[in-house]
Amino acid sequence: MRILMNKFVGAVQLIIDIGNTSISFALYRLDKMQIYCKLGTKRDLSFKELYKFLKVKFDYKVDQVFVSSVVPVIDTVLINAIVSLYKVNPLFIRFDLSYDLSFNLYNNNRFVLGSDVFANLVGAIEYYNINDALVVDLGTACTIFAISRREGILGGLINGGPFTDLNALIQNAYLLNDFNLAVPKKLLGLSTIDSVNSGVIYQYKYLIEGVYHELRHNYDKEFRLIITGGNSYLVLPLISVDFIANLYLTLEGIRILGNAFKGDY
């Protein structure tokens, strides 16, 4: 099977994932992650603030910058900071661009996908060199998407993430105060807070495992379960089926797509 390689051998690549809650940055050299850090997402993020952050954290000669963004209001600020500091134009990953991958993403249907989900699915198949995957990303939202090397993207489900669900409940329940979510010690809580905590977290365990078993039965495929996302730590200890945990899956997918992009930017 063909292995995707970086077209620019030895290139230093800055990979950026702009999410609703945080922005992840990773510096790669020779296809290996060297530095990783995060910055809170602010819709009023200024050029000066971002430039200073990049200068402090990534003061290197960067050859390429690949970006996934689900917060378009930040994109222009990012472009200006990248061009000013590194003198390169960033490539924004999108589902509707052309890529030289080892499989066809759209054998059956052409989906309109967020660039983060798109990167996750490509990362699952290409990075792990597997045939079928169920990819879960627990962040601001909970996305669960299935992909097959033979049949392409099969579709998915999107729910609110753990803290999104908790905040919605707190805002609509007069007597419920804010608290920090944690991995439940047991299924049944003995106080309101413990019960809410258990309810918020356990729903993802049963959702993930339920979808996993249903898909393996309906599609007759050996889906590999891959879990990522900044809030996945709340659910991972509870999952009772085999899974792969990779906090950097989205970044890996962005890097793979950037290297596989067919065109100029």
Swiss-Prot record:
Signal peptide: none annotated. The gene is coaX. Gene3D superfamilies: 3.30.420.40. One of its GO terms (molecular function) is ATP binding. Catalyzes the phosphorylation of pantothenate (Pan), the first step in CoA biosynthesis. It is found in: Cytoplasm. Substrate binds at G114, S115, D116, V117, T192. InterPro entries: ATPase_NBD (IPR043129), Type_III_PanK (IPR004619). This is Type III pantothenate kinase. Its EC number is 2.7.1.33. GO terms for biological process: coenzyme A biosynthetic process. ATP binds at D17, I18, G19, N20, T21, S22, I23, S24, T140. Homodimer. A monovalent cation. Ammonium or potassium. K(+) binds at D137. It comes from the Bacteria. The active site is at D116. Belongs to the type III pantothenate kinase family. It is an enzyme of class 2 (transferase). Keywords: ATP-binding, Coenzyme A biosynthesis, Cytoplasm, Kinase, Metal-binding, Nucleotide-binding, Potassium, Transferase. It catalyses: (R)-pantothenate + ATP = (R)-4'-phosphopantothenate + ADP + H(+). It comes from Borrelia hermsii (strain HS1 / DAH). Transmembrane segments: none annotated. CDD domains: ASKHA_NBD_PanK-III (cd24015).
